[in-house]
Amino acid sequence: IQGLKEEKYDIALCSRKEKESGIDFVPIAKEKLVVVVPRDHELAGRGSVDLKETLPYPQVYFTKNSGLRPVIDQLFEQTGGTPKIAYEILEDASMAGLVAENFGIAVMPEIPILKNLNVDVLDIENPPYERYIYLAKLKEKYLAPVVKEFIEYVKESNGKAL
């Protein structure tokens, strides 16, 4: 978002940031959030979990400046509990690595690297949620025709998946 504001980029793929009135956010994809636990964890093997059941365990959590942090905070608020944050991480692959090494459990996007790590991936039964990835652009910025065409292509290609 900062790069858009500084006009370093024409477009960005990101989480939606509230209170960004000068930016258009177009939803282009859904992203699944899951609970990731070490393979030998007592929640492993269950297939799915209520987020409230994760509250007693130390969590590897996204940093405050991550676009996912408010989304995950809101999910925990809906459970009526507060996670025990053991570590804060900016990048999801690093988060997965810490979980694999028994530093805690995590709520994070279901990313391909999880298949290669010593972790178990659990669907979130409750609370319900939807997470979107957005294409962002400045509302008042001139965009080259090729950029406009790319935006239209992304909207048409991914809009069907939403």
Q: PLM ranges: what are they?
A:
Residues 38, 62-63, 85, 108-109:
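Thr-Gly-centered strand-to-loop micro-motif
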